[in-house]
Amino acid sequence: MSSIPDVVNLPVPVPRPEAASHSTLTATQIGIFAIACGLTVANIFYTQPLIGLIGPALGLAASRIGLIVTLTQVGYGIGLLLLVPLSDVLENRRLVVMALCAVALGLLGIALSDSPATFMAASFVVGLFAAATQILVPFVSHLAPPAERGRVVGIVMSGLLGGVMLARPFSSYIAATLGWRAVFYISSGMMLTLALVLFRLLPQRRPGTGLAYARILRSLPRLVARTAVLRRRGFYQAMMFAAFNIFWTGVPLLLAREFAFGQVGIALFTLAGAAGALAAPIAGRLADRGLTRPATGWALVAAFVALVIAVAGGRLHSVALLILAALILDAAVQVCQVLSLRSIYMLAPESRGRLNGLFIACAFLGGATGSGLAPAIFTFDGWGTLANIGVLFVFAALVLYLSEFPYRGRRTP
């Protein structure tokens, strides 16, 4: 216990000059970093298509199985607020490697769990330490020469988005062939392997902020209060991610109950969402052309339309409409996120890491809300009501977006 005050109150030593650490990254190294981000963040989404299997296996009531997804995302949000700021205090390579080892242990705990309590606790641990992805991305940015930084970070972010999109079909297919516990055994092994690879590949990096951890944490509420862009963009993404998780937590239940889909069928359906990652580069190009604000509106409208289509798909018993809804919704959520991150990255560089963490935490707070609501609403009132609640979340974001237009004289990202 005596070590905790030291971490909280002791400023870090003055590090070596930052410029000395820049080097040319090889394509192989960049690819490994992208894979590492994708595999780590995927752990947050593995359970979404599996709740129909895991809930009965653990004896969870149908109205409570949303907690299977929610606690992982709550853990991730807390990790963004508490773990990621440590990257401004502690040596980064050690922090990333230790976090990946903790994720591996949490995944092993999930695989071995025989009760809801142990499963939930292990899920929280996985989410908490999977926030290491938001340490690794700026770490890689630091390693890249300034002239190559945008390209390198773009590739790594593509890996992260690919992990988000491919997690659901991967876990569905493995669960169908080897059982749901195998998903977490396999991922635990992958996390330990990644920890070893990154320990060998990453150089040591000591942050140069000179700030104490407690001071960094105390600065977070002030950043929220003083940064209008963060508040607005955080609300947009919280509403979008709530709708996203309502859809993706509820649709496996719909497919199993109304369409008699097995896990292989659900895996094939979830592949539709993977195409959403293709929208990220398009969003970046729109932002580079100065279209951040209108493109945000297009993304919000697209998400609204997608969820209306999802309602119709349930009523008309149409898998084709549900696939169309999945394609549009995933693309819209990714576009909104990329545009929002670009707006945030344009803000003060000395606060960029904390602003990024706060923004992603807002998104996952909304996502956890959607995941928690979805199974209970689906159980009590069906797909139509659930999808309409998703429509309302996106509508709330649209209302805030439209409220900006009377103030055209004031430029906002």
Protein language model features and the residues they cover:
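Juxtamembrane intracellular "pre-TM" segments in multi-pass secondary transporters
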Residues: 15-24, 202-235
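Conserved MFS/SLC helix-loop-helix module at the cytosolic interface between two early adjacent transmembrane helices
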Residues: 78-116
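Helix-to-loop junctions at the C-terminal end of transmembrane segments
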Residues: 80-91, 279-292, 378
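Structural signature of the two symmetry-related core transmembrane helices
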Residues: 94-108, 188, 294-309, 391
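Helix-loop-helix hairpin linking two adjacent transmembrane segments in secondary transporters
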Residues: 118, 148, 154-202
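Cytoplasmic helix-loop-helix junction between adjacent transmembrane helices
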Residues: 122-160
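C-terminal transmembrane helical hairpin of 12-TM major facilitator-type secondary transporters
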Residues: 293-340
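A late C-terminal transmembrane helix in Major Facilitator Superfamily
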Residues: 346-383, 389-390
